[in-house]
């Protein structure tokens, strides 16, 4: 039995999230279907670094799986690329030690959120970015983001449905990239993220960019540890990308 690590990307528009769910199309289900077919009907399960919600994309999701097939990692990559749908891509496949774990071995992740700042709605980017036709002061967003850097209890910045007992996470950095006059990318790097955390942080920073909330409001929300204390909405899923997963 050999363990394989794969880095995959996918367009989340056509999936009901990553995780297998009854009677729905998911990323995990499509990949496991292909692997099971390769193994002549024997079920093969995959493990990912984490789940993504409906409409959320991935540029660098990491999975692992075990196989008894006597084929190279390169052939696995080519076969899976052919046998999975066009909205999933296998960027790399490699053999790894048996103790490698895609989920529990992570030491950090990067998510990016894409904002289209056009006055007129662009139908071609509707599934891949948030349309935000309002004025933004990027300098205010940067000031607000500094209050979020470091180790904090992010209870106020995650969904009430978060299953984790501890809401303490460390944000290493929040960077802002103005790719052109119309596109703003916000990059979040941290040791881990809670359910809806990046989308809530994005909504908060957009409000800061409009002057609706101040850096002090963010500090107070962190201390309150109560999602109801935060006025900012959760940004929609289509602008969010799991960009990179780091391991030791």
Swiss-Prot record:
InterPro entries of this UniProt entry?
PsdUridine_synth_cat_dom_sf, PsdUridine_synth_TruA, PsdUridine_synth_TruA_a/b_dom, PsdUridine_synth_TruA_C, TruA/RsuA/RluB/E/F_N
Q: What class of enzyme is it?
A: isomerase
Instruction: Tell me the CDD domains matching this sequence.
Output: PseudoU_synth_EcTruA
Q: Which keywords appear in this protein's UniProt record, sorted alphabetically?
A: Isomerase, tRNA processing
Catalytic residues per the record?
53
Q: GO:BP terms for this protein?
A: tRNA pseudouridine synthesis
A GO term for molecular function: RNA binding
Q: What is its EC number?
A: 5.4.99.12
Catalysis performed (reactions): uridine(38/39/40) in tRNA = pseudouridine(38/39/40) in tRNA
Q: Which cysteines are joined by disulfide bonds?
A: none
Residue sites binding substrate per the record: 111
Q: Which Pfam families match?
A: PseudoU_synth_1
Job of this protein: Formation of pseudouridine at positions 38, 39 and 40 in the anticodon stem and loop of transfer RNAs.
Q: How does it assemble?
A: Homodimer.
Q: Which family does it belong to?
A: Belongs to the tRNA pseudouridine synthase TruA family.
Name of the protein in question? tRNA pseudouridine synthase A
What is the source species?
A: Listeria monocytogenes serotype 4b (strain CLIP80459)
């Amino acid at each position: 039995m050999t363990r394989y690590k794969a880095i995959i990307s996918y367009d989340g528009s056509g999936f009901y999230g990553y995780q297998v769910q009854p009677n729905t199309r998911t990323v995990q289900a499509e990949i496991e279907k292909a692997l099971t077919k390769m193994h002549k009907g024997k079920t093969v399960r995959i493990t990912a670094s984490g789940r993504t919600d409906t409409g959320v994309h991935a540029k660098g999701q990491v999975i692992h799986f075990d196989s008894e097939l006597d084929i190279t990692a390169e052939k696995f990559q080519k076969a899976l690329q052919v046998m999975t749908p066009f909205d999933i891509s296998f960027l790399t496949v490699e053999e790894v030690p048996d103790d490698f774990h895609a989920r529990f071995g992570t030491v950090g992740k990067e998510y990016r959120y894409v904002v289209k700042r056009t006055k007129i709605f662009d139908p071609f980017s509707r599934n891949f970015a948030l349309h935000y036709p309002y004025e933004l002061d990027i300098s205010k967003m940067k000031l607000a983001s500094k209050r979020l850097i470091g180790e904090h209890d992010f209870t106020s910045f995650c969904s009430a449905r978060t299953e984790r007992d501890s809401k303490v996470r460390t944000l290493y950095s929040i960077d802002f990239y103005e790719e052109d006059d119309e596109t703003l990318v916000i990059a979040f790097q941290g040791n881990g993220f809670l359910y809806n955390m990046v989308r809530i942080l994005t909504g908060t920073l957009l409000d800061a960019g409009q002057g609706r909330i101040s850096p002090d409001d963010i500090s107070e929300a962190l201390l309150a540890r109560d999602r109801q204390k935060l006025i900012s909405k959760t940004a929609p899923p289509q602008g969010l990308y799991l960009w990179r997963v780091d391991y030791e």
